Amino acid sequence: MMMREAFGSTIAELMRKDERICVLDADLANCNGTAGLRNEFPDRAFDVGIAEQNMASVAAGLSSVGCDVELLGVVPTPAVAYLVTKLGVSGGVMITASHNPKEYNGYKVYGEDGAQMSPEATAVVVEYIEKITDYFSVKACEFNEIKPQKGVKVLGEKFVNKYVKTLTKLSLSKKAVKLLGKDLKIVYTPLHGTGYTPVMKVLKKLGINVSVVEEQVKPDPNFSTVEVPNPENKEAMTLGVNLANKIGADVVFGTDPDSDRLGVAIRDDSGNFINLSGNQVGVLLTDYVLRRLKEEGKLPKNGAVIKSFVSTGMVKPVCEDYGVSLMEVPVGFKFIGEKIKNFEESKSNVFLFGFEESCGYLRGTHARDKDAVVASMLFAEMTCYYEYNKTSVYKVLNSLYDKYGYVIDKTVSIAYKGLTAMNEMNAVVDKMRSSTVKVDGFDILAVRDYLSGKRKGEITEKLEYSGINCLYYELVGGGFICLRPSGTEPKLKIYYSVLGSCEKDATEKIDQLTKGFEKLLK
């Protein structure tokens, strides 16, 4: 015991003096002597367990075929996207289960533009993988065999600090934060993932008061305190809400393990916590960003907001009121990243904000992927801004409903199992594609078939995107139904959206639409 403690304290002292020193240990999470190293040096102390073994193996494999590798350690997905463009490297790799259970741990790849690889580029990679018939014949090397001139460089904490500094430059309400940030009480949980260091750094740098859910701070590949580490789910936010009630906090943030999705819970007028949907957060942040840019005289004439087409249509009138273009893309933030790249090359538009209903948001062009760290900062300062203006986030949300109509968005997932799952899901979509859809109480304005790339209404029009197995039904009077197989898990996803005159009217409509359409699937 004493030897372990002496060993740990000596190494800690050396690491404080020399940022080049890194530690690889098999049990940092459990042993007494080195447990503190991971807390003090999260970017330089590696527990060579599940995640780090994968990370080191990938680094060694890339080096064995002549690649220089920048090893980041435990960092958020958007930080990888940021560094790809910052360093001008050929690509980036993130090993993550994202917001899914640990069984979904996988390999996320970024192109040299810092965006997730396009479907075309992904197809090329898959083609190479399928050519491998003997995995043991693939050229590889041990981590300790890497040649110095073609080796692995471990980036230090300076990288995280640069990332945080970049994000704080995107702040829109520094005056309100300076006055009220220290009084705002936020509870934050990284859900056993990568968000703790950057989220805490960016919020504290702005002077915002944050408390953390200690049980969920340490990176844990088993996600031990939750069934599914998805901040979209109310269950994943339970410990955070419990702590918030205990200490009287105003807001609860949760980031998924790779910190690209943000879940939020706020208090209503009765003081009870409500979990906001990704669509509600998307509308609030869109309105806030455009509002502040306009107030500061910085709203460009060619500004653009981008959303996936399954995300709420409530942002359309918001963008219209601010004179900003709203553009729709398929599901997957890579398509938003692709648009950002096109804007920069063509100078046609200035990117202002992007979001997906699945709790993914982005302000800024530092990354071409969703970023829960910058979203946390924006939501925190938005809360301060509205408090400074004698209102609240909850009141502003309801004022938007009063102004634009009450929109309810709902997503239903139907799970499939086994090797035939994809075929079964595609068969359901094909069946609906060949059918005339009629739902009692609703009229179909047009049908978008993203496989053929055609929109069929009174006239047939060409869509911007094609080759995607997705059907989208536009409803008369506002709203939609969208049907698509998930791209990350064996689930058929159905998205519903309705516009009502009030909450009661919209609730009745969404129930009627859901029941009516699901009858057609049987």
Predicted ranges, named:
Residues 104-111, 260-279, 315:
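Short Gly/Thr/Asp-enriched flexible loops that form oxyanion-binding sites at enzyme active sites
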Residues 40, 58-65, 82-88, 287-294, ...:
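Alpha-helix C-terminal capping segments
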Residues 1-64:
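Thiamine diphosphate
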Residues 105-239, 243-244:
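Gly/Ser/Thr-enriched, mixed-charge loops and adjacent short helices
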Residues 25-28, 44-57, 69-78, 274-281, ...:
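Active-site nucleophile and cofactor-binding loops and adjacent substrate-binding regions
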Residues 110-141, 279-303, 307-318, 372, ...:
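Glycine-rich phosphate-binding loop plus the immediately following alpha-helix
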